[in-house]
Amino acid sequence: MEVAMVSAESSGCNSHMPYGYAAQARARERERLAHSRAAAAAAVAAATAAVEGTGGSGGGPHHHHQTRGAYSSHDPQGSRGSREEEATRTEKKKKLHHRQSSFPHCSDLMPSGSEEKILRELSEEEEDEEEEEEEEEEGRFYYSEEDHGDGCSYTDLLPQDDGGGGGYSSVRYSDCCERVVINVSGLRFETQMKTLAQFPETLLGDPEKRTQYFDPLRNEYFFDRNRPSFDAILYYYQSGGRLKRPVNVPFDIFTEEVKFYQLGEEALLKFREDEGFVREEEDRALPENEFKKQIWLLFEYPESSSPARGIAIVSVLVILISIVIFCLETLPEFRDDRDLIMALSAGGHSRLLNDTSAPHLENSGHTIFNDPFFIVETVCIVWFSFEFVVRCFACPSQALFFKNIMNIIDIVSILPYFITLGTDLAQQQGGGNGQQQQAMSFAILRIIRLVRVFRIFKLSRHSKGLQILGHTLRASMRELGLLIFFLFIGVILFSSAVYFAEADEPTTHFQSIPDAFWWAVVTMTTVGYGDMKPITVGGKIVGSLCAIAGVLTIALPVPVIVSNFNYFYHRETENEEQTQLTQNAVSCPYLPSNLLKKFRSSTSSSLGDKSEYLEMEEGVKESLCGKEEKCQGKGDDSETDKNNCSNAKAVETDV
């Protein structure tokens, strides 16, 4: 029975008993069985000896020996086998007499039996013991603390690795039913080992990483973590890589759990995309050349130094001046003179002969090159061009530089000036070639001048609010596309309906379905200019339905856009707090070296570990720099506080 029990356990299906305590239990069970069998054998041997002592004459046994001898003379092989069997029986009888002397008090407890039966039981017992010894030598189960000696610890009872990376290689469990118990803050989970082994780089999938959380007393892994989050973590292993956040778990808490269980950056990024956030851009590397690095920091990172902050202020002022000039030149007081100057520069003298204002402009020598607006525009373009060329020279990667949307905006804001300048020079060199060509050149110049309005987006390089707005719009492209699609369907539907509803009205404003597009857009967006309105009852009903549908259409995607805006706003706020903390920490000479290394290695990204951020903040508060700030901020302190502050200053002096 014991052999069957051991083989069943070693086949790989009973993995819930602690390995060390299971070995101890088996050892105690074997010891009890050995004592009970020895006592029974001693009792039977005593009874047999008593029967043989009262059996009469000694001829009986002598007769048996003669019979066996006669039989063995006819069969030599049988005689040899019988002699070996006789020797075995004699040896076992000696063991019986030895056990009888060890347990003389058990002779009255067991009934008498035949010698053959006793020998058969002893033979089975020895075979069982030999099989158990072979299994222990093969390493099917661990030894108990008695086998290890008095110096055995719980760490010795943990599953050992043979170096092959298999984890529990010394325990021959079957992969199909080897199970593991995981305790998360008192909530027990049970799964198969092969399920966790699908992701060997994670905390639960790597035997070496999870061993530190193993509890040998209960044969389970204990994690003092968030319990509701582990349902999704375990489902990640069971589903082969699908990570879904539980509804009752906040986003930041679940993100911390994903990082703790080391599911990987790819799983975290995929989870963030499923939650509706855009994939974060990788941190841009700095140039390797020290000179280029300093230039890049000056023009790209205004917060890096005071000169960089000054360059950013100059850039913002130039952008504002350019935008103001772009708006002022469209005033009627300046627009007429500027158009005449451009016409004179283009060679349109014949058209301006009858213009009363033309002679004084032409006689005064006004050209586009001495126009005040052109001069100010030239100064702004010189700065924009200088800034763009320097940043292009010092950038770490030319390919990434020209792919950046901000740099594309810089190019678009610079090109119109050079195109306009080239067109003016070509017109002066070629002279007037007809009114049609002049009209064409004026139209092109107006379009090119309109492109200059994109310079306002250059402010987003120095404005956190515009950056947050840009991130929000980019993260909400799916919702914005859905909103536009719904509006498109509504415009087509309601413009057609109002056209046919107003078709019989002679004074209607809706002469065609395309004419009704404007009314449908204005009504669905709840603007309602009133320039076009339905007159009939049917048209008014259609207008009412159009307004209600517009409210519902716009209201559905708006919460998602607002949620994205709140996320980017809070992320930027936390980023500013973390940057301020980092600057204060680096300037503190009394901060521990391990925390100082974290501060210096931390980037400007606000997606860092929140626990690490809190740890760094606590380190700053507990350092001598934090105590110094407390001492400076207090006016009326107790005697103990004054002594603490003086001691802190003394320590600073010693340092």
Curated annotation (Swiss-Prot):
Motif (PDZ-binding): 653-655
Intramembrane segments of this protein: 514-525, 526-533
Catalyzed reactions: K(+)(in) = K(+)(out)
Intracellular or extracellular location(s): Cell membrane; Cell projection, Axon
Residue numbers bearing the Phosphoserine modification: 123, 601
Protein's recorded name: Potassium voltage-gated channel subfamily A member 4
Chain ranges for the short sequence motif Selectivity filter as given in the UniProt record: 526-531
Comp. bias (Basic residues): 91-100
Upper classification of the organism: Eukaryota, Metazoa, Chordata, Craniata, Vertebrata
Stretches of the chain found on the membrane's Extracellular side: 329-372, 427-441, 500-513, 534-540
Functional summary from the UniProt entry: Voltage-gated potassium channel that mediates transmembrane potassium transport in excitable membranes. Forms tetrameric potassium-selective channels through which potassium ions pass in accordance with their electrochemical gradient. The channel alternates between opened and closed conformations in response to the voltage difference across the membrane.
Glycosylation: residue positions: 354
Annotated region described as S4-S5 linker, given as residue ranges: 464-477
Organism annotation: Rattus norvegicus (Rat)
